[in-house]
Amino acid sequence: MARYRCCRSRSRCRRRRRRCYRRRRRCCRRRRRRVCCRRYTVIRCRRR
């Protein structure tokens, strides 16, 4: 299962080994809450 998180700056995501994709307003699922991304959507993959 993949976890979705929202990021404000791409550099911050890249620093945490995450990939940032710029998309329109998209809804991400963070644990049991729904977070909306404005510009960047970060997709965190399962470790190894």
Swiss-Prot record:
Q: Name one GO biological process term.
A: chromosome condensation
Q: Where in this chain does the entry annotate a coiled-coil region?
A: none
Q: Which InterPro entries match?
A: Protamine_P1
- Entry keywords, A to Z: Chromosome, Developmental protein, Differentiation, DNA condensation, DNA-binding, Nucleosome core, Nucleus, Spermatogenesis
**A Pfam family annotated for this UniProt entry:** Protamine_P1
Compartments (UniProt record):
Nucleus; Chromosome
Please indicate which superkingdom the organism of origin belongs to.
Answer: Eukaryota
A GO term for molecular function? DNA binding
Chief location of this protein? nucleus
Q: In which tissues is it expressed?
A: Testis.
**Family of the protein in this entry:** Belongs to the protamine P1 family.
**Function comment:** Protamines substitute for histones in the chromatin of sperm during the haploid phase of spermatogenesis. They compact sperm DNA into a highly condensed, stable and inactive complex.
Protein name as catalogued:
Sperm protamine P1
Biological source species: Eptesicus fuscus
